[in-house]
């Protein structure tokens, strides 16, 4: 099991934090465990409440069913079902940017 440094950013919500996240832990869960509140609703990858956007690094979100190919290609992720696969940077609170 690998552990990665995940930087979570949201200028609007005053979030600039780097957390440790194992490669088998969802980003949302790791953030909550380390005291960072992020938006969520379904926790199943079936809505867009927890959407983020990866600006650096690799994420595995193969369990998601909501985002279309264009959104995934643009770097959007659902933090409730996304695992880090490298050190990465994720803009959080991005649901409004999806549309």
Swiss-Prot record:
Residues 4-96 form the 2Fe-2S ferredoxin-type domain. Keywords: 2Fe-2S, Chloroplast, Electron transport, Iron, Iron-sulfur, Metal-binding, Plastid, Transport. It comes from the Eukaryota. The keyword Ubl conjugation does not apply. It is found in: Plastid, Chloroplast. GO terms for cellular component: chloroplast. One of its GO terms (biological process) is electron transport chain. Ferredoxins are iron-sulfur proteins that transfer electrons in a wide variety of metabolic reactions. NCBIfam families: fdx_plant. Forms a complex with heterodimeric ferredoxin-thioredoxin reductase (FTR) and thioredoxin. This is Ferredoxin. It comes from Trieres chinensis (Marine centric diatom). The gene is petF.
